[in-house]
Structure formats: C-alpha cells, structure tokens
A protein has these predicted regions:
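Short linear sequence motif anchored by a di-proline
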Residues: 1-199
C-alpha cells in the first residue's frame, strides 16, 4: 500500500501541467504522507469546466470501527466509497513526481521509488470529501503491473494517462470506472535508494 509520495514541483508549475487555476496554494515541493496536506486538482464535474488546484489533507476519516485515516481506495463497491465515486465533482487528480513502496522484512526494508520518465509530473486517480475541519483526499488502487508487483504484489495506485484526466473529472461512474487499471510497466521506472524510512 502506497503511503508516501513526492511532488517535487512548485504550485505554479503543477497548475500549468494540469491546465488548472493555482489559486493561493502555497505548495513549493516536497513529500506527502498520511495526515499531511498536498495539492489536488478538482473541477465542478461538468465537461469543459475550469480545473482548480486546492490543498487537501491525505486520508479520509476512518469508518466507525477504524483507527487510522484511510488513504487508499480499494473496494470500489464499498458503501464507504461508492457515494463519493459516483459524483464526478468529488473526483480529483493527485499530482505526483514519484511514489514509494517498501520491500523486505522489518529492520531490513528497502525503499523503491517509482516514476514515469516521459511524465515528470503525473496523476493518481483520486477522490475528495469534506471532513469536519479539513477537506481530505484518497486515491484509488488496482492490481499491480509487473514492475510494481515485483516489489508490492497486492496493489498499486491508479495512474491516469493525460488524455483521461477529463474523463476522470467529468464522466459518469460507469465510464470513469474503466480507467481503474494497472499502468503499463514499460512506461515506468523504479529506483532503489536503500535509505531508511523518511517517517
């Protein structure tokens, strides 16, 4: 499960990349972890509507019996998610420059950073929801491709192709759901840094 990613670009560069209004987001680059804010791209869910970049806190408040914030959307038919997924205005793009998965046993873990060489800034398929104090976000996961699966065989984030950004932000759920699929391995790269966890 991906619980750390980097977005090493300032707000104005991200806004240009996603053809979005940067607003007053102060983001100047860095890492995003659960319960930390990160920029996401939203719209009002209608075709042709202007995209906006806004700060959101990573991690939905947990369900009644949960403890930790929910950062990844796995069961797309769960009542916990489906109400949000069906509303295009509550879907978002999560800008990323690389994301991390761990391998190895406790005490001997290695970090693996995944990126897209042809897209220095790419996007996860995300959703957002207004919580009591903060608007929050999470991103969808799917079966891993060959590259990610060699490190983390359970799941990988849903990475969107740029030509699918509008569909994710505006299409009805039946159409948007078809975008939930592993990103092609041949378009990705991985780097092992061997460093201890940042958190």
């Amino acid at each position: 499960m991906c619980n750390l990613y980097r977005l090493d670009a300032p707000a104005n560069q991200i806004a240009v990349q996603f053809d979005a209004d940067p607003g007053d987001d102060p983001w100047d680059g860095g890492y995003v972890a659960p319960l930390r804010p990160g920029p996401v791209i939203v719209s009002d869910g209608r075709a042709g509507s202007r995209r906006r970049m806004v700060p959101r806190l990573w991690g939905f408040p947990p369900p009644p019996k949960g403890r930790a914030p929910v950062t990844n959307v796995r069961n797309l038919d769960s009542p916990f998610w489906i109400g949000t997924l069906r509303h295009p205005e509550l879907r978002c793009l999560v800008p990323v420059t690389r994301f991390q998965e761990w391998s190895g046993e406790k005490g001997h873990k290695r970090a693996h950073w995944f990126s897209l060489p042809s897209q220095p800034i790419f996007a996860f398929a995300g959703i957002w929801r207004q919580a009591d104090e903060w608007a929050t976000f999470a991103f969808l996961t799917c079966e891993p491709n060959r590259l990610v699966g060699a490190v983390h065989p359970k799941a990988m984030p849903v990475i969107l192709h740029p030509e699918d950004y509008d569909r994710w932000l505006t299409a009805d759920w039946k159409d948007a759901r078809t975008l939930v699929a592993p990103f092609p391995s041949q378009l990705m790269a991985v780097q092992d840094d061997g460093q201890p966890p940042l958190l």
